[in-house]
């Protein structure tokens, strides 16, 4: 019964995203093989409060629909579909393999037919088909964002870092704030060691310390990233808790981070045994990025006490970090404008692939940006266009999460441009999702 309920709730609340299932009406015709299950059918009726009408052909109504469309669109041309005789004579063999083109390692199904014909499925981009990835150079701002936020920065050599090495995990809020922290620590004389791009192996490194299976996958990955830093022999790891992001939309209700981003550094400290070793200095201070003034004051209080760094140095480093964080936002907006101009000049279409900052992680987005560009469609991020539009306020939701305030602005922009559509990525469907 619980499984049947979860199937319906997931479909109505997470996929269709209904506010109230009872809005469907009093009588609903259902289709699809899933509704052959009486428990699922009854769960639908209980949750929606309607009378569900299940035709005898519910499981094949989609096939009937496709046949009717084909009939309507028939133009009198001979079909390329094989004849019954050719189908009976058809011989093929199927094998499975893993694509080695990128970290997604897609599971490919290779069907080999007579006449040296081959059909491959399961791939998320051209690489699985043996083709050149993004041959037409379709803009993909997920690639640019990863370059600008992470690969753009080159750490100091150890010999040039008088205060040593600090490890920073490539997780959660770091997909938004890493430019600040890299600049801040570099200006203070630290060499910044960033954990690698997420992968299944990184996840498995930290699997023993994950306290709950109900956490979102991006949070679970954090355990592997911190464990990786520990195994590199680092003696200093910094992973702050950020309850408040910077004020990006002044007239929004607030600018919180989600509860996971707010405090996950604390969760890591309490669940990874190696961090109980006095040999590792692990810092996870609660810090607000609300404004440069508030942030700087907190950093001075913390680093002067914990690391013995003079206030003047901390203030100077914080200012440089703040400027760099602003520069990244400006660069993203500039790149967004360039892609919009490209779409205008070429007549192509664009998808705003909107989500949280960590959705630029290929392990978390599962290669969806590459899949979209393989169809000749440009990919933009929500933060590349959010500054180009405003939201009519008050909103019908309580607008108090900073990332979502950005999503609303991006969605408002998309609604006004016919050459754009928006797809929202979410890894858990929590909170305002």
Describe each region flagged by the PLM.
Residues 13-21, 50:
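Conserved helix-loop functional segments at active or binding sites
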Residues 38-43, 52-53, 110:
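Oxyanion-binding/catalytic loops of NTP- or PPi-dependent enzymes
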Residues 11, 24, 30, 40, ...:
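Extended, hydrophobic alpha-helical segments in both membrane/secreted and soluble proteins
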Residues 56-57, 74-433:
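An N-terminal assembly and electron-transfer interface module characteristic of large anaerobic redox
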Residues 6, 19-45, 58-59, 173-175, ...:
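Glycine-rich phosphate-binding loops at beta-strand->alpha-helix junctions
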Residues 1-13:
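Adenine-nucleotide phosphate-binding core of ATP-dependent small-molecule kinases
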Residues 2-5, 29-34, 53-63, 196, ...:
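Active-site nucleophile and cofactor-binding loops and adjacent substrate-binding regions
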């Amino acid at each position: 019964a619980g499984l049947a309920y979860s199937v319906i709730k997931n479909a109505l609340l997470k996929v269709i995203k209904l506010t109230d299932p009872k809005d469907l009406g009093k009588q609903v015709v259902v289709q699809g093989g899933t509704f052959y299950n009486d428990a699922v059918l009854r769960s639908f009726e209980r949750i929606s409060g309607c009378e569900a009408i299940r035709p005898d052909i519910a499981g094949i109504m989609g096939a009937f629909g496709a046949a009717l469309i084909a009939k309507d669109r028939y133009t009198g041309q001979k079909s390329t579909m094989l004849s019954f005789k050719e189908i009976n004579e058809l011989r093929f063999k199927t094998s499975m393999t893993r694509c080695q083109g990128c970290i997604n390692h897609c599971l490919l199904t290779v069907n080999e037919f007579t006449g040296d014909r081959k059909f491959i499925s399961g791939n998320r981009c051209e690489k699985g088909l043996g083709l050149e990835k993004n041959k037409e150079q379709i803009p993909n701002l997920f690639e640019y964002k990863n370059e600008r936020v992470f690969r753009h920065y080159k750490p100091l050599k150890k010999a040039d870092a008088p205060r040593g090495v600090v490890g920073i995990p490539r997780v959660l809020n770091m997909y938004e704030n890493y430019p600040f922290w890299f600049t801040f620590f570099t200006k203070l004389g630290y060499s910044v060691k960033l954990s690698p791009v997420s992968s299944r192996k990184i996840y498995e490194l930290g699997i023993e310390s994950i306290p709950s299976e109900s956490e979102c996958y991006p949070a679970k990955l954090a355990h592997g990233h911190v464990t990786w830093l520990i195994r590199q022999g680092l003696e200093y790891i910094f992973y702050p808790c950020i309850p408040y992001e910077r004020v990006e939309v002044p007239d929004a209700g607030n600018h919180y981070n989600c509860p996971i981003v707010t405090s996950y550094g604390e969760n890591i400290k309490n669940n990874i045994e190696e961090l109980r070793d006095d040999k590792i200095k692990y810092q996870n201070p609660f810090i607000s990025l609300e404004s440069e003034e508030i942030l700087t004051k907190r950093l001075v209080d913390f680093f002067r006490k914990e690391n013995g760094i003079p206030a003047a140095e901390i203030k100077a480093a914080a200012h440089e970090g703040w400027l760099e964080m602003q520069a990244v936002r400006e660069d993203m907006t500039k790149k967004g404008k360039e892609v919009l101009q490209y779409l205008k000049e070429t007549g192509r279409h664009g998808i705003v692939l909107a989500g949280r900052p960590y959705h630029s992680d290929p392990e978390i987005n599962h290669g969806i940006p590459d899949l979209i560009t393989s169809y000749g469609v440009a990919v933009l991020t929500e933060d590349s266009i959010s500054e180009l539009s405003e939201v009519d306020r008050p909103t019908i939701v309580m607008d108090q999460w900073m990332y979502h305030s950005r999503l609303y602005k991006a969605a408002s922009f998309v609604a006004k441009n016919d050459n754009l559509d928006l797809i929202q990525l979410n890894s858990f469907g929590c909170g305002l999702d």
